[in-house]
Amino acid sequence: AGGFKEPHWDWSVEKFYHHWFASDRHMLGLLDELGWRDKVLFPRPFTVMYHQGKFYPFDSILKAILFPGLGWGVHKARFGLVGLYLRLTNNWQGLEAHTVDAWMRKWAGDFVYQLMWQPLMNGKFGERYADQVNMAWMWARLKARTTRLGTYTGGFQAFADQLTAHLRSLGVNIHFSTPVEQIEPQPAGGLSLRIAGQSVPYDQCLVTTSPGQLARLAPALPPNYLQGLLELKSMGAVVMTLSLKQRLSEQGYYWYNIPKSAGFPFLAVVEHTNFVSPEHFGGDHILYCGDYLETDHEYFSLSQDELLKRFLPPLQRINPHFEPGWVKNAWLHRTAYAQPVPLVNHSRNIPAIQTPVPGLYFASMSQVYPWDRGTNFAVEIGRRAAGLMG
């Protein structure tokens, strides 16, 4: 949830676009505790879906009914009934034994699945995992999310900075840019953290990295626990952020969902300043172009200039008047751990928060299942971990 800020901006911009939902009770509850709820904004942005060369609004029940791709017959009825069932049921345990691919083809039908859901799965999980993800993931996505999207006044970096200052005022020591190299249990109890070549003793340690990073940090974990960590799959993310001289979407659309089959070099285009005003960014129009990818994809090795040459021309398919000269600045951010991949019966494979090493705890986005990753569930699992640590 890190951000960055240009000198002429009043607000920060996130490196990897995200937002809160109106249903995010853990995150909003924390903000209530801190007395900062009044700084949460819930604008009403517009989301669109690509179909046969055009973009159509798709962010409400009415817009879904009017979406031309489904027609007016049985396909639209099956789409609506499946969506209604998934919102009403709480039996995610029964769903996780089935893949999204198999379950949706059976109940929504091949046509509806291939038009509406398969592009999402291909975009999120790539060719390797798209047909392996279990149905509980889709259930949780539809169950928890709302059309209202929230952000924090000043940007999420402003929230992080305020929280840091608040914690320090309570006597909490926070060390930035201090990477831990290894975590080792001590014979007399407790843990030793190697930091900059020095061993520092601690009674307890909560690791919040990816599962693979924990395995590298704590090789003293039992082999079966280490193997379980390394078997968990995830997708990386590549996000290009652009500041433009003028708005890209003439209609004021915020989120463009783009299927891989459409031939765009990214999964989504998100015009942040159609969500919050460009006045917060000195009049700049902020645009994200992002994709979920496996870490061996070429986007993880191409330079920013090489990616710009690929990303800019397709923007003319959104606005034919777009020109590269509109771009004032660009920033490229990549992460190897962005989207956990929950396979069939994933609940059996989730590592416990309390690891087999006394005093060592683990809380990550791979453990908030069946829910999808997000700051809301980071707060929830953080509270659970704190309760276990006493």
Please give the residue ranges for each predicted region:
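Conserved N-terminal glycine-rich FAD pyrophosphate-binding loop of Rossmann-like flavoproteins
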Residues: A1-H19
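Mobile amphipathic helical/loop "lid" adjacent to a hydrophobic cofactor/ligand pocket
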Residues: W11, S23-M135, A140-T147
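Short beta-strand to alpha-helix junction loop
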Residues: H18-R25, W92-V100, A108, K143-H166, ...
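A short coil-to-beta-strand element that immediately follows conserved catalytic motifs
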Residues: L41-F42, A237, Q251, F322-R334
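FAD-binding beta-loop-beta segment adjacent to the flavin cofactor pocket
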Residues: N134, V276-G282, T335-F362, S366-Y369
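Mid-domain catalytic core of redox enzymes
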Residues: P179-L287, Y292-S301, D305, R310-H321, ...
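A conserved FAD-binding loop/helix module that cradles the flavin
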Residues: M365-M389
